[in-house]
């Protein structure tokens, strides 16, 4: 099936030449290209046109979940008849398995999985395996181990109307795919049998399931049903049932893996005993033997991914199978906001290796567990397909790959120029930013404010709230879907002011924004670097009446370069508008939120529980993020006790 771009717009501004240049580069087999596209110039629309023109599948990597969600929404709008999928980390809370030698504390892996995102991940994998017209929008989590596509595909079951099956064998096959049987509980990853009817709820459907109608051993009919009501949606001729776990393999392969696991265990035990490390030896022997027993009995075990070397026939040090293994050969890779995303990809491996080493050294895991990891940067480089890096401020790596050549997209189709930048003294910045925000809100626009610290963001939000202003703030403890919901509320005028630290830079797409305020702009550093300032100023470039205010008592080198680059772009944009008689027009973008989280509130007997648990959960997430696993585990236990009251 071809990619069908659905839009009322035609490429304009710099878009036509950018699309032509990028398509030509792909056709000329250029491995790397850079699109230097300013905020609001329609980079996503350019990507969509490149995909449609080349008719090639695509993987788009974003550096955070909020930006990935925006890209997913936009791509679904552009390609409603094709498979647009979403692949980010499915953890609302994640505490990896860890050992702290200082306190002799072992912390078991613990996580809270977001079921909706888990379903979307399965859907992405299945679309890549079943159809060519697929676009996957992913976060950097796509470089983490996922399971072998060969093993995954080999375990699929395809059924057609008229097929004859042995019912008991088929039910066993479903169990081998990690589907669970329950006549009462029917949700993703479950199946049930009632008389001559078998219902199967695939892992990659949210509210639909399949129904097999049997006459004897023959499949008389296959239906797609509403998973809640059981009502038939439509009749279908054929289905493919994919496994309910990525880390799955045939029973024969699994049994073959047992012997080399035992051999590695014996080698490691010999090492520990030679070093007189009796505790470590006993710990490893007990744990590994238990895992082997579970794998033989049930086909899986807790932490089975740590045995991936043997399950997938890998050699020591081989790159783990990831989402990249599932991609078609002619896929196009778009790295959005590449100046942030590329360094993120490079940083993932080191943190994982440090944690694993402690587990292995102290007898909690075999050395082969090292192979359950994210890709190293060099591995990612070697396997990535033709790549287009996209950023308003490309990094050194991207430009080095293209010999400093890039396709520039500075002219916006809307005629909007980069915003006027005003520098004001930082001394009275809080008083002034409140006043400027009130003026902007009266004009019918919303406000973005960026601070240097989370504490300052919270205090400013509290101060504005006391002045009866509708305000919220973004920070790293807020989940991906909650962030999306906050941005949705800002656009729909449920709130007027959004305050954040480092979350208001790349990719936040809010045409209703009439003011971007940067507090302490003269504090030189990562958050106030030239790149950060240009990106933050760019948040005001989707509205013809928007401004940017930088609060500073002096003009730093970063400020000077950012202001000069912004002015250079403004002059070029104004010249184009005059030459082509273009009047600046604010972007009109539908307000949608298809990823809005479905919130279920648990009523407890103590009125304070909701707020208390919310506060504790934020602390738990912060400790886990800072690798303070012992503290995170303590707080998790407290939350559990409160919820049981």
UniProtKB/Swiss-Prot annotation:
PROSITE patterns: HELICASE_ATP_BIND_1, HELICASE_CTER, UVR. GO terms for cellular component: cytoplasm; excinuclease repair complex. Residues 610-645 form the UVR domain. Transmembrane segments: none annotated. Keywords: ATP-binding, Cytoplasm, DNA damage, DNA excision, DNA repair, Excision nuclease, Nucleotide-binding, SOS response. ATP binds at residues 37-44. The keyword rRNA processing does not apply. One of its GO terms (biological process) is SOS response. It is found in: Cytoplasm. Residues 24-414 form the Helicase ATP-binding domain. GO terms for molecular function: ATP binding; ATP hydrolysis activity; DNA binding; excinuclease ABC activity. A motif (Beta-hairpin) lies at residues 90-113. It comes from the Bacteria. Residues 426-591 form the Helicase C-terminal domain. Forms a heterotetramer with UvrA during the search for lesions. Interacts with UvrC in an incision complex. The UvrABC repair system catalyzes the recognition and processing of DNA lesions. A damage recognition complex composed of 2 UvrA and 2 UvrB subunits scans DNA for abnormalities. Upon binding of the UvrA(2)B(2) complex to a putative damaged site, the DNA wraps around one UvrB monomer. DNA wrap is dependent on ATP binding by UvrB and probably causes local melting of the DNA helix, facilitating insertion of UvrB beta-hairpin between the DNA strands. Then UvrB probes one DNA strand for the presence of a lesion. Belongs to the UvrB family. The beta-hairpin motif is involved in DNA binding. PANTHER family: UVRABC SYSTEM PROTEIN B. This is UvrABC system protein B.
């Amino acid at each position: 099936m071809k990619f069908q771009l659905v839009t009322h717009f035609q490429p304009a501004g710099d878009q036509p030449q950018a699309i032509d240049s990028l398509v030509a580069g792909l056709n000329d087999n250029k491995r790397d290209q850079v699109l230097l596209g300013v905020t609001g110039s329609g980079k996503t629309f350019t990507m969509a046109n490149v995909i449609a023109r080349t008719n090639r599948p695509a993987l788009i990597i974003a550096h955070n979940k909020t930006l990935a969600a925006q890209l997913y929404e936009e791509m679904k709008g552009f390609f409603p008849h094709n498979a647009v999928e979403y692949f980010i980390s499915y953890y609302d809370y994640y505490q990896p398995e860890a050992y702290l030698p200082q306190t002799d504390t072992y912390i078991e892996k613990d996580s809270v999985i977001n079921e909706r995102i888990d379903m979307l991940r399965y859907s992405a994998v299945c679309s890549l395996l079943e159809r060519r017209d697929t676009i996957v929008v992913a976060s950097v989590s796509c470089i983490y181990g996922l399971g072998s596509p060969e093993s995954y595909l080999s375990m699929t079951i395809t059924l057609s109307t008229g097929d004859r099956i042995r019912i008991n064998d088929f039910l066993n096959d479903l169990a081998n795919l990690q589907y669970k049987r329950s006549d009462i509980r029917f949700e993703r990853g479950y199946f049930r049998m009632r008389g001559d009817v078998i219902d199967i709820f695939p892992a990659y459907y949210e509210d639909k399931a399949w129904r097999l109608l049997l006459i004897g051993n023959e499949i008389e009919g296959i239906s797609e049903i509403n998973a809640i009501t059981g009502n038939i949606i439509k009749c279908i001729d054929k289905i493919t049932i994919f496994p309910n776990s990525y880390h799955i393999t045939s029973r024969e392969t699994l049994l073959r893996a047992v012997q080399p696991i035992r051999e590695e265990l014996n080698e490691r035990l010999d090492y520990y005993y030679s070093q007189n490390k009796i505790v470590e030896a006993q710990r490893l022997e007990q744990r590994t033997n238990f895992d082997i027993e579970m794998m033989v009995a049930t086909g899986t075990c807790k932490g089975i991914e740590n045995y991936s070397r043997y399950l997938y026939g890998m050699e020591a040090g081989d790159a783990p199978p990831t989402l990249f293994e599932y991609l078609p050969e002619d896929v196009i890779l778009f790295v959005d906001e590449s100046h942030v995303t590329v360094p993120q990809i490079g940083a993932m491996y080191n943190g994982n290796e440090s944690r694993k080493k402690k587990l292995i050294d102290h007898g909690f895991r075999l050395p082969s567990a090292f192979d359950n990891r994210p890709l190293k940067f060099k591995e990612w480089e070697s396997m990535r397909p033709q790549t287009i890096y996209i950023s308003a401020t490309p990094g050194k790596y991207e430009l080095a790959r293209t010999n400093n050549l890039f396709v520039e997209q500075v002219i916006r189709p809307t005629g909007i120029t980069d915003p006027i930048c005003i520098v004001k003294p930082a001394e009275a910045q809080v008083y002034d930013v409140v006043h400027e925000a009130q003026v902007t809100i009266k004009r019918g626009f919303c406000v973005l404010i960026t601070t240097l610290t989370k504490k300052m963001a919270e205090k400013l939000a509290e101060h504005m709230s006391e002045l009866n202003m509708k305000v919220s703030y973004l920070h790293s403890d807020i989940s991906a879907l909650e962030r999306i919901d906050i941005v949705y509320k800002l656009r729909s005028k449920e709130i007027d002011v959004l305050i954040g630290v480092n979350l208001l830079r790349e990719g936040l797409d809010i045409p209703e924004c009439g003011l971007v305020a940067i507090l302490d702009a003269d504090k030189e550093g990562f958050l106030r670097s030239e790149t950060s300032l240009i990106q933050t100023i760019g948040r005001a470039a989707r509205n013809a009446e928007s401004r940017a205010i930088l609060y500073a008592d002096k003009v730093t080198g970063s400020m000077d370069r950012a202001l000069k680059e912004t002015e250079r772009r403004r002059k070029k944009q104004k010249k184009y508008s005059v030459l082509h008689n273009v009047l600046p027009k604010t972007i009109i973008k539908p307000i949608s939120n298809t990823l809005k989280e479905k919130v279920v509130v648990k009523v407890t007997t103590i009125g304070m529980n909701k707020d208390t648990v919310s506060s504790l959960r934020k602390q738990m997430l912060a400790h886990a993020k800072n690798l303070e696993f012992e503290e995170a585990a303590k707080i998790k236990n407290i939350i559990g006790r409160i919820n049981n009251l």
